Amino acid sequence: MKVTLPEFERAGVMVVGDVMLDRYWYGPTSRISPEAPVPVVKVDTIEERPGGAANVAMNIASLGANSRLVGLTGIDDAARALSKTLADVNVKCDFVSVPTHPTITKLRVLSRNQQLIRLDFEEGFEGVDPLPLHERINQALGSIGALVLSDYAKGALASVQQMIQLARKAGVPVLIDPKGTDFERYRGATLLTPNLSEFEAVAGKCKSEEEIVERGMKLIADFEFSALLVTRSEQGMTLLQPGKAPLHMPTQAQEVYDVTGAGDTVIGVLAATLAAGNSLEEACYFANAAAGVVVGKLGTSTVSPIELENAVRGRADTGFGVMTEAELKQAVASARKRGEKVVMTNGVFDILHAGHVSYLANARKLGDRLIVAVNSDASTKRLKGETRPVNPLEQRMIVLGALESVDWVVSFDEDTPQRLIAGVLPDLLVKGGDYKPEEIAGSEEVWANGGEVLVLNFEDGCSTTNIIKKIQKDSDK
C-alpha cells in the first residue's frame, strides 16, 4: 500500500505545559552493596532527554513540523541542558524562567534493560504568575494550526481554562493530555486524550467497549469537548465524537519494551497531523501507528517520518525498514540498550535472487538485528559499469526492507561502506564471497571496537550478472 503522509512541513504547533528533563544512568550490575541489600550499578553511560511537554514538542519536530515549546523552568543546568538539546532538534523554546524553583528532573537508573529506581527533583510551579504564558500563546495563535496543553500536574497549566479560551476564540484546536480526575478544568477543549485508567478514574470502571462509548459520550456532553480519544494500551484506541460512530483502532505494536512517553507521541502526532490539514480520523490513524513504533523503544522517544511510513505499511517496530543514516544510528543505539546483537552486511543487491535471500537469512541467524547497507546508483555505476544498476536505489531498498530477515536498510554513496560501518560499529560484520576477513571494508574498525568479522558463502549458481546475461541472450533469439 502506498501511504501518503501528512504535509508535516506546513504544520505549526505550539506545546504549552509541564517541561522536564529525563536523565538516564546505565551500567552493569554484578554485586550487592555491603551497606544495604541493594544492587551496585557501575554507571558507564549517562543520557539526558527532554521529557513531559518537551517530549511532545520533540515528537512534533521529529516529523518535520514547526514545533514551539512554552513552559516553566528554573535557572539551572537542567534548563540549559533542555534548551540546548531541544534547539539541536529544531524545537523553538520560549521558557519562562522562575528563579525560585528548580527545573523538574527525573533520574532513572537502569541495568540489564531493567529500571531499578527513579529519583525526582522537583518543586511544583503552582502559584507562579501565568500571564507570561498567556502572552506567549497569544503571540503564536496566528501562525499555528494546533495548541497542545501537556498536563503533568506540576503547575504550568494552573490557568488551563484561560488558555483553552484564548485558543478557541482564535479558532485554533486545543488538544490536551489530561492529568487527574478534574475534567471540568478542561471544559471546551477540542480533544482530550486520556489513557484507559485516567478515563475510568473519571467515568468509572468499564466492563465492555459499549460502556466506554456510553460513558465517553457523556463526558463529551458534560464538559463540551469536541472529541475524546481513549488510549487503551494493547487494545488500541477508541475515538468518540458527537453524531458519529465510535472508531476503534487495534494496536500496531509488535513488541513492548517501554511505554514511557507513549502518550506524548500520540498527542504530538495528532497535533501535527491536524495542523497539516488532515481530518481527526486520519490523525488518529497516524497516531496509533506511531504509538506502535515508540513503545518498542527504551525511554522517552520520538518517531521519524520514515518510521511512521514504515509503520503504516505494516512494518511497525523500532524503525524497521528503509532508514537514513542518522535514524539507523538511533535504532542501533536502542537495540544495544535492549541487549540485542547487531549484524551488518552490504552489497548492490540489484536483481534480488535466491542466493541473496538465502545469504541474508543466514546472516540474520547470527544475531538479533540485521542491517543491509546498499550501494547508491552512482556507487553502483562506478563499481559495475554504466549499464548498472538495473533497478534504482529506492526499489532495491524497498525490496530488501520487505524481507523478513532484514531489519534495517540504509544506502551509502562511496565505493565502499567503510565510513558508514565505522559510524555504526556493528557487533558482527558479514560479507558474502571469497574474501579474507581483513579485506572486508570496515573490518579494522569493527575489530578495534571488539566486534567480529565473518565471511559467508553465497549459494552456488546464483548471480545477478548471469541473470542479466540470460535475459539478454533470450531477447536476442
Curated annotation (Swiss-Prot):
GO CC, alphabetical: cytosol
Its biological purpose: Catalyzes the ADP transfer from ATP to D-glycero-beta-D-manno-heptose 1-phosphate, yielding ADP-D-glycero-beta-D-manno-heptose.
Stretches for region Cytidylyltransferase: 344-477
EC assignment: 2.7.1.167, 2.7.7.70
Record keyword Nucleotidyltransferase present: yes
Region (Ribokinase): 1-318
GO MF annotation, one: heptose 7-phosphate kinase activity
Originating organism: Citrobacter koseri (strain ATCC BAA-895 / CDC 4225-83 / SGSC4696)
Keywords linked to the UniProt accession: ATP-binding, Carbohydrate metabolism, Kinase, Multifunctional enzyme, Nucleotide-binding, Nucleotidyltransferase, Transferase
Biochemical pathway: Nucleotide-sugar biosynthesis; ADP-L-glycero-beta-D-manno-heptose biosynthesis; ADP-L-glycero-beta-D-manno-heptose from D-glycero-beta-D-manno-heptose 7-phosphate: step 1/4; Nucleotide-sugar biosynthesis; ADP-L-glycero-beta-D-manno-heptose biosynthesis; ADP-L-glycero-beta-D-manno-heptose from D-glycero-beta-D-manno-heptose 7-phosphate: step 3/4
GO biological process: one example: ADP-L-glycero-beta-D-manno-heptose biosynthetic process
Binding site for ATP: N195, L196, S197, E198
SUPFAM superfamilies assigned to the protein according to its UniProt record, in alphabetical order: Nucleotidylyl transferase (SSF52374), Ribokinase-like (SSF53613)
Catalytic residues of the enzyme: D264
Homology family: In the N-terminal section; belongs to the carbohydrate kinase PfkB family. In the C-terminal section; belongs to the cytidylyltransferase family.
Signal peptide coordinates: none
Protein name, UniProt field: Bifunctional protein HldE
Domain of life: Bacteria
Lineage summary: Bacteria, Pseudomonadati, Pseudomonadota, Gammaproteobacteria, Enterobacterales
Subunit details: Homodimer.
UniProt keyword Translocase present: no
Catalyzed chemical reaction(s): D-glycero-beta-D-manno-heptose 7-phosphate + ATP = D-glycero-beta-D-manno-heptose 1,7-bisphosphate + ADP + H(+); D-glycero-beta-D-manno-heptose 1-phosphate + ATP + H(+) = ADP-D-glycero-beta-D-manno-heptose + diphosphate
Stored HAMAP family: HldE
